Amino acid sequence: MKPTRKALLTCLLCTPMIVAAQTEEPASDNAGKSNKEEGNRNVMLNASSANGPREIQIGLPSTDVNVLENGLPVTFATNPHSVNSNWRMDASHSHVGLLKISETAITTGNIGYAVNSWTKLGEKGFHGSLNYKTNHFGMQEFSLNVNGSLANNWLYSANVYQDFDPGTFDIKSSKLQDRTQIYKLALTRLYGNGRGQFSAMYHYSNSHPVSNYATQSAPFIYVGDGSVKEYGKFKLGTTSYLPVDANMTYRDMRTGEIGNISLYDAAENRSSQVYLSNKYAWDNGLTWTASARYDHARGAFVYQTPMSLTYVKDNPAYNYKTINALGQRENYTGDYVQSRMSCLNAGDIDELLFTTELSKKFSRSTLRVGFNEWLYNIDYASNTTMYDQSVAADGSYPVRVYDANKRDYYFYDFNKNASEYYKGTENKLAAYLTHDWDITDKLNAYYGARIEWQRLNGENAAVRNAAGDYVGRFSDYHLGATAADGTVIRPVDLNYNWVNYDLTAALTYKINRQFGLTGDFTYIVQHPRFENFSPATLPNTQKITVPLGRAGFYYNNKWLSLTSLFSYISKTNNNSTLNLQHGAEIMAAPMSYDIQTWGWTTDAIIRPFKGFELHALFTYQKPTYKKYETSVTFSDGYTGSINATGNIVAEIPQVLIELDPSYMITPDLKLWTSFRYFSKTYANINDAYYFNGRWESFGGVDWKVNKMLNLGCTVVNFLNQTGAKGSIAGAELITKEDAGNYSNCLMTGSYLRPLTVEFTAKLNF
C-alpha cells in the first residue's frame, strides 16, 4: 500500500468523507438535493489543495474517495486513477451535494459520505457560464459551459476545463504542479409531456497531478515538544524538496527492462468516457432511471516517498558524490543525505458501470429498488526505485547524490521496496432496496438493504517458494526474475467470489415542532478490493465489517438549529503494508488490524440577527487501534516489532472545532471567515512523536456585482501558520521510550499549505 494524502478534518460522524463546496440548483437533469443528502458542508476550502475537495477523516483510515457523477463513481478505484485527475467541481455541474452515509452504503457498498454531482445536460434557450480562478502564486483555472436548444426537444451542453497551477514553489522537473484539462459534450432528447429524457455524453480528461509528489514532504527540525522549527533557510510550503533532475530510471515490473521517464510523463492520466442515461416518469408516481458509462483510461499516481535521513558529514563510512552539468563527479560536502523511494504507479484501465433504479412515490412513503453492474479491468504495476539526494540548509534545490563506496550511479534497489503488480477484473453485481416512510406526522423511518456479489479474477506477484513461504521483493525484482533461493517469479492466479451486504435503518421522532430525537445504524460487510492484492503477500481475505451507530437530538427555532449526536464506528481486517526502516534497510511488513472510534459531535447554525450566521461544530472522538501487531527481521538479525493495540490512531486528532461566521453587509456583499482547530495528533503508529494542535484559517469576500457577474476573494491561512502535519518519514519503529533521543533532530514529513490569496470570477450569460 502506498502513502495517502490526508487532511484531517471533521464533520458529524466518525468515518472518512470528502465533500464539495457548494450546491447549485439543477437545470434539466435529474439532479437535485433530497433527504438523501447532507447540507451545510463548505469544504472546497481545502488547506491541502488549491483545486480539490478536502478529505475529512474521522476515526477510520482513509479509503477510496467516494465521488459520484451522474449516479456513478467517478473512478472505480483511486489508485492509480485518482478522482482529482478526472473530476473537478466546475461550470459543467448543475448540482453538487453530499450523500449521507446510509445512502452511500446502500447504493455503492462503500463506507462514508460521497460527493453527489450532476452534469448540466442543457436547458431550452441559450445559457453560458464562465468561471475563472487565480492566486498570487500564478495559478490560472478556467471553466466554460454553454448549453441550450438544438431543435424541438433536443438540447446540448458543452464544457471546457483548463487548469495551469505552478504550485506554491518553483520546481525544476516541470513548469506546473497541476496541468489538467477536461472536455465534455452532451446531447439530450426530452420526452413528451415532461416525462423525462435520454442523454448521451462524451468526456475526455488529461491530467498531470505533479503536486501529489512535489508537495509530499519537506525537512524540518522536530523540537521534541510537538513543535517544529525550519531547517536553515528551507521554508515549509514555499521551498522545493524535489531534486533538479526530472528523469527517473526504473526496472519494468513486467518485462525486467531498464527504462527512463520524466516524473511529469510518469504522472500522466488520460480518460475517454462514453456516458448514457435515461429517466422516465409515469403518472402513477413510478420513475425509472438508468445510467451507464464506459471508460478507457490510463491511470497514474507518482510518489517520491522520503525514507532514511542520514548525517554523513565527516563520516568515513560514506563517500557521497554528485555529477555536475559537465558530467564530472564531485564530492558532496553537505551535512545530510535523504534517501527516497520513487513509486511509479500506472495501469491501463477499462471500466463498464451500469446502475438502474425504479422508485414509486406513495402518499406517505417512497419505495426504491436498484441494481448495479460494475466491471473493472486493469493491468497495473508499480515500479519502484531508490535514490539519495542532498538536504540543503540554504534553501537551494536538492541534487541527487550517490555513495561511491556502494555504487557508481544514483539509482539502486529497483523494485526491492513496495513494488506492486496485479492484472485482471473485479466485478460487482448488486441489488438494493430502500423505503423512506412517514409512519405518522411525528415519526419517520428510513431503512434499506443491499446484497452484492463481488468477483476477482486475475493474477498478481505474491510468489511463494518451495517451502510455501512468500519470497518477497528483492533488488531487480520483476516477472521472470530468479530469487536467491532459486524461485522463479511467475504470476500467481487469483480467483475469489464473495457475498457482501449492507443494512441501514434510521428513526426520527418529532416530540414537538422544535425538538426531536434521531438515531441511525448502518452495518457494512465488505471484502478486499483488487488493489489489496498488489503487494508481495496476499491480504487477509476475511470479511471486513463496519458497524456504525449514532443517536442524539435536534432542536430548531428561528435563530438556532442544533444537532448533538453520540456515535460509534469500528472496522475489522484493515489490510495495510508498512515500509519499516532500520538503518539504511527498508522492509515491507504486511498486516491486518482493527480500529474503533467513540465520538460526540455537536453542530449548530446560529442566526442572532439579520445578515449574520455562525456555523459551529465541536467533535470529541477517540480512535484506537485494535489487534495492531507486526514484526520484521532485517538482514543484520535485528527484529523490528510494533504493538500499537490501544494506541490513538496516528494523524487523527481527538478534538476538532469548526467556526464559520459570515455577514451579509448588503444583499449582494458577503464577508466570511472559517476557522478549523485540530488538537494534538500523533505522527507515528507507536504514538512516540506528535504535533501540537493547530488552526487552519480562511477568509474572504463574495460580491454579486449584478445578475451576470460574481466576484470573490479568498485568503487561505490568513493567520499564516507554518509547520508540519501528518506523519514523520521512517519513524514507524520509534517507541515512546526512544522518542526523547530525537529532540531537535532533522526529520521529514508533510506540512501546512502557506498563506495564499485567491481571486474568483463567475460570468453567466
Predicted feature residues:
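C-terminal beta-signal and adjacent terminal beta-strands/loops
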Residues: Q22-E24, K680-Y682, V701-F765
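Acidic, small-polar-rich N-terminal luminal/periplasmic segments of exported/outer-membrane proteins
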Residues: Q22-G125, I524
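Outer-membrane beta-barrel translocator/receptor signature
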Residues: T78, A91-H95, T104-Y183, Y191-F198, ...
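Repeated loop/turn-to-beta-strand initiation elements of outer-membrane beta-barrel proteins
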Residues: F126-H127, N153-Y156, N193-F198, G285-W288, ...
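Outer-membrane beta-barrel proteins
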Residues: K133-E141, D163-N193, V210-N212, N247-K279, ...
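Acidic/polar loop-and-plug regions of large Gram-negative outer-membrane beta-barrel proteins
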Residues: K175, Y183, T188-L190, Q197-Y275, ...
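Structural signature of Gram-negative outer-membrane beta-barrels, strongest in the C-terminal barrel
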Residues: G347-E351, K361-R407, F411-T572, W598, ...
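Gram-negative outer-membrane beta-barrel transporters
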Residues: D441-K442, W559-S561, S567-T572, P590-I685, ...
